[in-house]
Amino acid sequence: MPLPNQIATSNVETKNFASLKRSDEPIAIAQASRTPAKIYFDFQATTPVDPRVLDAMLPYFTKKYGNPHSRTHSFGWESEKAVETARKQVADLIGAHEKEIIFTSGATESNNLAIKGAVDWKAQDGNPVHVITTQVEHKCVLDSMRFLEEKGARVTYMKVNKDGVIDLEELKRSISDDTVLVSIMGVNNEIGTVQPLEEIGKICKERNVLFHCDAAQMFGKLKIDVNKMNIDLLSISGHKIYGPKGVGALYVRRRPRVRLVPLFSGGGQERGLRSGTLPTPLIVGLGKAAAVCQEEMQRDLSWIESLSKKLYTCLKENIPNVIKNGSLQTNPLRWFPGCLNLSFPHVEGEGLLMALKNIALSSGSACTSASLEPSYVLRALGNDDELAHSSIRFGIGRFTTPCEIKEVAKQTTSAVKKLRDMSPLYEMEQEGIDLKTIKWT
């Protein structure tokens, strides 16, 4: 059976999708269960649960319901064994030891525990602390940084270039004697930019600074090796990799040992770092999702890349002046192709979303989608407010089909042309008027 990257996307027949993509029955079931009239293109916000993951979880809701911390009977032993199996499945995907995996409620909690926990531990001696991050991190990381600033920590927010990538030399210059932590995400949730983690980790190790990575958008999609990348803390989400919502994990390096102050008190579960009864069904789901990614990551990536290129090519060929936000670099990889962020000048992003009401799209992070403010990520790239307001994020995933790519390209092209026809500014630009020279009153 040919793999997705061996198929010319222009020749892919929709009716043959199942035979080209997977022979697995669960994949076919997942595709068949989706409503044809609605198309899901928001895989950065969340992913559907893979049928194989659901099958693994179900027994722990109904039959194997023991508390994994109850060690006096077989119900508890059974659940504990399932949790430890999942712990190893997660660890294997990032090249870690299973004892380095702490289960949490999701990447937001993992980020908070990593950042606040590490800084609080370092600050116990009363010395000043300095933390480095970037201007394009997820909101939960930026809010954690502001929390630390209110407590007296000094925080440096590094700028990024037009592709969303940090300057490694600037990172070196930013590290000072009181720097205790560098927190930089692996893949950006809005533009898909991939940061040079191995180089960042090397710098941090040389300067004896902890390196935390928010890998919510990277885990299970791109190769991660925490030892090769010298990552000390790594945040993981379950629902971004076709697992359940409400579960995640934090990798915490053991050698040399990374010390954290827990966020809250309780029974001392998870090595005393995260108290509370573990949700066995959700953890089993996270473990199974990680195991599936371990087997199919490269196949998924090849498939997603082929569909992403097809969509981008179709839109560029049929819509004038389409701007790609973020990098297109593939060697080394600086962009995850499942996250395609495009700007359509003279088209309001919110208006385009309304015009494409049968397609699940986003104009930015799901956590800030209720805000009408322009994306702070796009503004950090140097885009003005108008361009930032005209952006749409196309999310492509494991279950996306060529038929959906074709339909999304068709509907987007039609909607953009219709909205531009209603724009007097676009009409003026088409007539050769340089809008930047006009003095508006």
UniProtKB/Swiss-Prot annotation:
A Gene Ontology biological process noted in the UniProt record is: intracellular iron ion homeostasis
| Alphabetical UniProt keywords | Iron, Iron-sulfur, Metal-binding, Mitosome, Pyridoxal phosphate, Transferase
Source organism's superkingdom? Eukaryota
The subcellular localization recorded is:
Mitosome
Which reaction equations make up its catalytic activity? (sulfur carrier)-H + L-cysteine = (sulfur carrier)-SH + L-alanine
Under the heading SUPFAM superfamilies, the entry gives: PLP-dependent transferases (SSF53383)
Record PTM N6-(pyridoxal phosphate)lysine, positions in chain: K240
PROSITE patterns linked: AA_TRANSFER_CLASS_5
State the Gene3D superfamilies in the record.
Aspartate Aminotransferase, domain 1, Type I PLP-dependent aspartate aminotransferase-like (Major domain)
* Entry GO terms, CC: L-cysteine desulfurase complex; mitochondrion; mitosome; nucleus
Cofactors named for this entry: pyridoxal 5'-phosphate
Q: Binding of pyridoxal 5'-phosphate: at which residues?
A: A107, T108, N189, Q217, S237, G238, H239, T277
Q: Recorded E.C. number(s)?
A: 2.8.1.7
Q: Where is the active site?
A: C367
Under InterPro entries, the record lists: Aminotrans_V_dom, Aminotrans_V_PyrdxlP_BS, Cys_deSase_IscS, Cysteine_dSase, PyrdxlP-dep_Trfase, PyrdxlP-dep_Trfase_major, PyrdxlP-dep_Trfase_small
The primary site where this protein sits is: other
What job does the chain carry out?
Answer: Catalyzes the removal of elemental sulfur from cysteine to produce alanine. It supplies the inorganic sulfur for iron-sulfur (Fe-S) clusters in mitosomes.
Which family does the similarity line name?
Answer: Belongs to the class-V pyridoxal-phosphate-dependent aminotransferase family. NifS/IscS subfamily.
The cross-references to PANTHER family, in alphabetical order and at most eight, read: CYSTEINE DESULFURASE, CYSTEINE DESULFURYLASE FAMILY MEMBER
**Subunit (UniProt):** Interacts with ISD11.
Q: What is this protein called?
A: Cysteine desulfurase, mitosomal
Q: What is the organism field in this record? A: Trachipleistophora hominis (Microsporidian parasite)
Q: What is the lineage of its organism?
A: Eukaryota, Fungi, Fungi incertae sedis, Microsporidia, Pleistophoridae
